[in-house]
Every structure is written in structure tokens, then in C-alpha cells.
Regions:
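N-terminal export signals
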Residues: 13-15
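Bacterial N-terminal signal peptides that target proteins for export
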Residues: 1-11
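Transmembrane beta-barrel domains of Gram-negative outer membranes and organellar outer membranes
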Residues: 26-286
Length: 286
């Protein structure tokens, strides 16, 4: 498979806004969802925009993507959905279309937690809504279970993950043995991955981010597996419910792209939990 950034990394970047740096509200960044979720349930609606240039043995070009995101955080779980649309240029020819739908669920494990540490398990999946013959989708379902942790020390947060990804298809039935498929967010048919992100608060509303992601093929299902390592740095800004994230990513190995920029904007709606024994809101009208 082409040396490219994985779908898991794309989901990770997009979902930072589900729980962007808000220590005051007890929310943390995680991969791909919130680790220590909000004290109160909340809904996050946003949009992710990314742009990258790439070069491989078959194609030279660039792509731009826009993806609406919807996330829900609860003290017992966090969930999200993301559906990208792309403009993709391949050797001077331009195409447009949807990418693969991404879904994710994360659950914290109370026995793993203390005052500064939270951890748990998650499961992400992509569904083949993008056309594989247009290099916009994988053409099959991909499942991505993971273990995650979040360590919070006042102005510094560390977020890490260890995961596994497996396509629900065989090598012969997939497009992975024909070169770069898809260009926008390919993965090995079977791989292990890990990520580590650090966040430093430099202002009450501003955090700086530095992170790395790596993945390596495992098993004999991969016809042309490829190891890749990607680093990124960026900034997170929060103003009340509005959250803004900007990041620049570059490959160390695997050459997924020459460079990629990611911009995310979202708004968080915190939902107050109803007190036990309280009457329903409509009761006073009777």
C-alpha cells in the first residue's frame, strides 16, 4: 500500500475538537476521542478542513478536504461521527467526492483512573462511503480497537494510544495490492499503531501541541505493507464554547504527503444533568 497517513490519524486530528484543551471543564484530548470526559454531558458540532500535497510512484498532486463532525461526551462514554468530502488532483486531473464515514466510541475504565490519570478502551470504524476507484475510499470496512491513556499535570497534558487496525476483507478482494488506494487516507490491511501527544498551556485559553503517530503492518494479509511515522505541531484556542485548532503535519518515514495542514473549528454545547427527583420540565404546565 502507498506510504500514506492512516485513517486513524485523520480521525484523531478531527476529533481533538470533541475535547479540546479545557482542563477547567475536566475535558482532555485523546486519540481518537476524549479520555477523561466532561463532568456534564455535552454535544460538539464542528468542521475540519485539511490540505496536503503528495508524490508517489503513480501520482503527483494535492487534495483538500472538508468534514462536518459531530461528537457527544458523557461521564461514561464519548462518541463521534465524521464524513469528509474531498477535492483530489491526480496528475493534473481533478475529481470530487465523499470519503469514508468514520465512527468512534471510547469508554473510560474507572479502576484505571486517579486524580491525574484516566485510561480506557475505544473502538473506531470506517464505512466505505467513498469510491475506491476514485482514490477517495478504501472500498471495505476497517475496524480499529485501541487502549488510551491521559495524564494531566496542571499546565501539561500527555495523551497516548496503542491500537490495532484490521480490514474486513482479504488482500485479493481489496484495492490495497494495486498501489496507492486511496490517496486521501490509506491504511495497511492489518497494522498496529501508537501515538503520543503533549499539550502545554501557555495561556488560560491557549494550548500548544506536539505529537507523533506511527503505524506498522502486521500479519501476512498485507501485499505491500508500509511503515509510516508522522509528527505534528499546532495550537488550540478555546473561547467559551468556541474551539479552534490548527496543526501542521510532516512525515518522518513512509512519505504519506509532503506536508499537510489541518484546521478545525467547533462549538461545544454543555448539557446540564437533571437532578435526581426533579420534576420534568413540562410538569409545571399541568
Amino acid at each position: 500500500m502507498r506510504r500514506a497517513v492512516s485513517t486513524r490519524l485523520a480521525v484523531t486530528a478531527a476529533l481533538l475538537l470533541v475535547s479540546a484543551a479545557r482542563r477547567a471543564e475536566a475535558a482532555q484530548q485523546c486519540h481518537p476521542l476524549a479520555g477523561s470526559v466532561w463532568r456534564n454531558p455535552g454535544l460538539m458540532a464542528g468542521v475540519r478542513i485539511d490540505a496536503a500535497g503528495y508524490r508517489n510512484t503513480s501520482y503527483l498532486g494535492d487534495y483538500q478536504g472538508i468534514a462536518p463532525t459531530l461528537g457527544f461526551n458523557h461521564p461514561k462514554f464519548a462518541a463521534m461521527a465524521l464524513l469528509p468530502a474531498y477535492r483530489l488532483a491526480r496528475n493534473g486531473r481533478t475529481g470530487y467526492g465523499l470519503g469514508d464515514l468514520a465512527l468512534a466510541l471510547r469508554v473510560p475504565v474507572p479502576s484505571f483512573a486517579n486524580r491525574s490519570l484516566s485510561a480506557g478502551f475505544g473502538l473506531a470504524a470506517t464505512l466505505p462511503t467513498g469510491k475506491s476507484d476514485a482514490d477517495l475510499g478504501m472500498g471495505h470496512v476497517m475496524l480499529m480497537p485501541e487502549f488510551w491513556f491521559n495524564h494531566d499535570r496542571e499546565r501539561v497534558q500527555l495523551v497516548g494510544t496503542v491500537g490495532f487496525a484490521r480490514a474486513l476483507t482479504s488482500a485479493g478482494a481489496s484495492h490495497h495490492n494495486h498501489g496507492p488506494r486511496p490517496i486521501v487516507n490509506p491504511m495497511n490491511l492489518s497494522e498496529i499503531d501508537a501515538s503520543l501527544n503533549g499539550f502545554l498551556r501557555v495561556h488560560a485559553k491557549v494550548w500548544l501541541k506536539l505529537g507523533a503517530f506511527g503505524a506498522a503492518p502486521v500479519g501476512n494479509v498485507n501485499v505491500q505493507g508500509m511503515t509510516r511515522v508522522i509528527v505534528g505541531s499546532g495550537v488550540l484556542v478555546t473561547v467559551r464554547g468556541l474551539e479552534l485548532s490548527a496543526e501542521l503535519q510532516a512525515p518522518l518515514t513512509g512519505a504519506p504527503f509532503t506536508a499537510r495542514g489541518v484546521l478545525q473549528v467547533g462549538y461545544r454545547f454543555e448539557l446540564k444533568r437533571r437532578r435526581r427527583g426533579a420534576a420534568p420540565a413540562h410538569a409545571s404546565h399541568h
